[in-house]
């Protein structure tokens, strides 16, 4: 039994390209599609386009997590997720483990002939959006033997958005998540690590559904499709490449320019999301504290009750490598507590659209 991607009984979450409803494209980490069904087997047909690293999709089937390797060929491929299941109700959440190192098109699910698709529970009414970098994507998170250490050599196999502090926090708070994050990215173009050697920054990518020019035509995002209650700005670490001007001179022209651009970006998002609460932060990945001091300065300058600066207990000094699962759990615990301390009123859903 073929289940088309535009079947109304499928449930989606994330910044996903639905221009072709029969072939939606998952771009961002933590984007997912969920299907509830009765039956004994399920497969999925996907078309993968890869820029770098090996591509892997993740899934949660009846509470148990798994993954599978995607082919590097651009054509459609059918992947068996499970066979010989008990003939009862099942829930599958198929999610994007990685950022735009690849994009994947969903072409449908295949169930047994005697299967039945069920209507899933509604998504949470609470909504979070994270604008961040590789840490927010869960990059190299599964390399748990390297907690507090530099990264091991890898080909993307340790990256898993499920274990990002961002998705952990959303689950803690029973909220939807748009993880609008990209590994290696900085705020400004020509800085950071994403799309070397020219380097694309958040300013060029934040308003796109497709922003990886090696994989597809660049395409704008319609912000009316998702209105978050809480917005987390979690960047300012890759910005020290190729030059850590903030560490060298806090008052330099480059440093002041960064603060001005950060403020303009924040104020633009505040206009797009006029009722949202904003949390400005970085992570425990090692970086010079002047980046966080700059963010604090912007927060004070904006001087809005909707804007908060948050520092983790190990902010900027926790690890020289990416954040592993135990470290992400601690970050999530601290961030969850901070968001909860802001009160229930930040989740007043009457102020927001109902679109997922």
Q: Where do the PLM segments sit?
A:
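Short, surface-exposed beta-strand/strand-loop-strand elements in extracellular ectodomains
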Residues: 54-64
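Extracellular serine-dependent O-acyl
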Residues: 277-348
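Active-site segments of SGNH/GDSL-like serine hydrolases
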Residues: 232-239, 262-297
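Glycan-recognition and processing domains
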Residues: 1-27
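Conserved SGNH/GDSL esterase-like catalytic core that processes O-acyl groups on lipids
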Residues: 28-30, 151-251, 285-292, 322, ...
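Serine-esterase "nucleophile elbow" of acetyl-processing enzymes
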Residues: 56, 90, 113-192
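Conserved small/polar residues in nucleotide/adenosyl-binding loops
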Residues: 352-356
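Short, well-structured beta-strand segments within conserved domains
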Residues: 42, 76-104
């Amino acid at each position: 039994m073929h289940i088309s991607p535009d079947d109304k009984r499928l449930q989606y979450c994330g910044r996903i390209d639905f221009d072709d409803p029969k072939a939606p494209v998952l771009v961002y980490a933590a984007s997912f599609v969920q299907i509830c069904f009765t039956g004994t087997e399920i497969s999925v047909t996907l078309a993968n386009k890869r820029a770098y690293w090996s591509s892997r999709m993740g899934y949660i089937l009846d509470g148990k997590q798994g993954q599978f390797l995607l082919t590097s060929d651009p054509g459609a491929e059918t992947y068996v997720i499970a066979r010989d299941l008990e003939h009862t109700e099942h829930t599958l959440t198929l999610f994007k483990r990685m950022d735009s190192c690849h994009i994947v098109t969903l072409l449908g699910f295949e169930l047994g002939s005697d299967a039945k698709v069920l209507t899933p529970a509604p998504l949470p009414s609470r909504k979070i959006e994270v604008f961040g970098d590789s840490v927010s994507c869960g990059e190299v998170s599964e390399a748990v033997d390297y907690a507090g250490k530099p990264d091991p050599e890898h080909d993307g196999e340790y990256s898993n958005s499920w274990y990002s502090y961002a998705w952990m926090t959303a689950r803690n708070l029973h909220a939807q998540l748009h993880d609008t994050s990209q590994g290696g990215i900085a705020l400004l173009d020509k800085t950071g690590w994403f799309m070397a050697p020219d380097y694309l920054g958040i300013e060029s990518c934040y308003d796109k559904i497709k922003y990886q020019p090696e994989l597809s035509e660049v395409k704008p995002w319609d912000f009316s499709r998702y209105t978050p209650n809480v917005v987390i700005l979690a960047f300012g670490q890759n910005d020290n490449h190729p030059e850590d001007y903030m560490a060298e001179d806090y008052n330099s022209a480059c440093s002041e320019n960064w603060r001005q651009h950060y403020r303009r970006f924040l104020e633009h998002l505040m206009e797009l999301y006029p009722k949202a609460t904003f949390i400005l932060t970085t992570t425990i990945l090692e970086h010079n504290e002047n980046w966080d001091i700059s963010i604090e300065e912007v927060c004070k300058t904006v001087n809005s009750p909707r804007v908060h600066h948050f520092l983790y207990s190990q902010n900027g000094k926790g690890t020289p490598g990416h954040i592993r699962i135990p470290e992400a759990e601690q970050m999530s615990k601290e961030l969850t507590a901070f968001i909860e301390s802001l009160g229930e009123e930040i989740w007043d859903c009457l102020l927001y659209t109902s679109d997922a």
